[in-house]
Amino acid sequence: GASNVAANLSNLISEVKLYGELALDVSSDEVLELTKEHGIQCRISHSLNVTPVKTRFVGNEGQHILRLDVEIPNSKNRQIETPTEKILKDISVGDIVIVSDYNKGSIEKDTVQKISDITDLIFVDPKQEPEIYNSAFLVKPNMKEYLKWNGEFTTDSAIQFMNKHNWTWLVLTDGANGMH
């Protein structure tokens, strides 16, 4: 998820920092090693008891057949500094912040607002209600998520929805139909 985004970014720009939550276990060691190979600075909070593991089963032709996710919901130890607290200490005016929200509790209702008090360049891959992302520069839901939020898709309704949430850009991914 977020590690893949960070790895791809590290091929484009020189300084990438990754914030998130992992446990102190073998799976988190693998994530940290991969990010190190890509020159990514890790600012990971070790606040989970078990690191979520995603296993993809791939066919002979490279097609994904199945993905198995293993995680323990609500396995957090909130005595440790959160990713949001770390981000707020690190970012400056003009920094670009990419928020990959998996709705696991790392992105709180005021996270984007707090970040936007420092920098305007916030790009969001959302999973929660749209109000959480007010003031983001770009929000990129898939069409299913957007229709759940807004009920319909027309260019005019999308512009109104974008303005309502103070987003500069709204990009909808729509499978085989591309992006809107």
Predicted segments with their positions:
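Substrate-binding N-lobe of the ribokinase-like
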Residues: 1-52
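Residue-level signal for inorganic ion chemistry
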Residues: 9, 97, 138, 142
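A structural signal for isolated positions on well-ordered beta-strands in alpha/beta enzyme cores
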Residues: 17-21, 43, 96-98, 123, ...
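Conserved phosphate-binding/catalytic loop of the ribokinase/pfkB sugar-kinase fold
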Residues: 43-49, 56-91
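Short acidic, glycine-rich surface-loop motifs adjacent to enzyme active sites
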Residues: 91-106
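Conserved phosphate/ATP/ADP-binding segment of small-molecule kinases
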Residues: 106-180
